Amino acid sequence: KRRLKNLILNVVKNPFNMIVLISLIILFCLIIIPLLTMIATTFTAGQAELRRIGDGAQVGDFTLYYWQYMLASNMSKAVLWEPLRNSLIIGVFVVIISVPLGSVLAWLMVRTDIPGKKILSMLVIIPYMIPSWTKALSWLAVFRNSTSGANGFLAGLGLPIPDWLAYGPIAIILCMSMHYYAFSYIMVSGSLRSINSELEEMGEIQGASKPQILRYITLPLILPSILSAVIMTISKSIGTYGVAA
């Protein structure tokens, strides 16, 4: 008991521990409890669905109706599986475009002496500061065709703009890629700056070519940052509604 008492006193006396404890309590009250409550309601019958559930169901009875309706009903394909498939496809292609683009830009800014590097390093971040839906509006202003009414800039010049370029997955993927490449740029550039340059110099002294140094020394060291950028990019692109709308 005395050890437990001393442990509690040590935790309470440490301001950092108290901040963590208070944060966990707030997290539990504002997020965990409402989330569990919301999940629990999906297993209880509601007044509006009693007729559909049938079998003499009463309000509050246990039911799997909502999960069956979402996962295995006639509406599941239209309201769940197709949107989920499209979101995953878009997320994967956004990663394929934006992560290599941001990583290459990071390497150019950190490992090369291109002119105007300081200004370019600031300009590279600006697209992420602008909301993604504004890029979608800019895309429409340039590529919109007569299908939606008013012509965009290129259609106004008399150029035929196909629907697949003006709207749809390709337009969404490109707009999101122009927005989310900043994730990989920021993460990879920070990782490159933290790498001890002596490791690359030693590889060069041993006769390794630049591609070999990049492949066997630099890339393994920045791989965690690239994987973090992949996770951030695909999660954000899947959850972004403004561009698609």
Give each language-model segment a name.
Residues K1-I8, D55-L64, M70-S73:
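Short, membrane-interfacial amphipathic segments enriched in basic
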Residues K1-S23, P211:
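Transmembrane alpha-helical segments of polytopic membrane transport and secretion proteins
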Residues P15-R52, Y66-R193, L219-A245:
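Membrane-water interface segments at the C-terminal ends of transmembrane alpha-helices
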Residues G60, L84-S87, G207:
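Polytopic alpha-helical membrane proteins, predominantly small-molecule transporters/carriers
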Residues P115, A208-S209:
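Short coil/turn motifs that cap or connect alpha-helices
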Residues L199:
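Helix-turn-helix DNA-binding elements, focusing on the entry/boundary residues of the two helices
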Residues M202:
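Donor-sugar nucleotide-binding helix/loop cap in glycosyltransferases
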Residues Q206-G207, P220:
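Glycine/proline-centered hinge or cleavage motifs at structural transition points of membrane proteins
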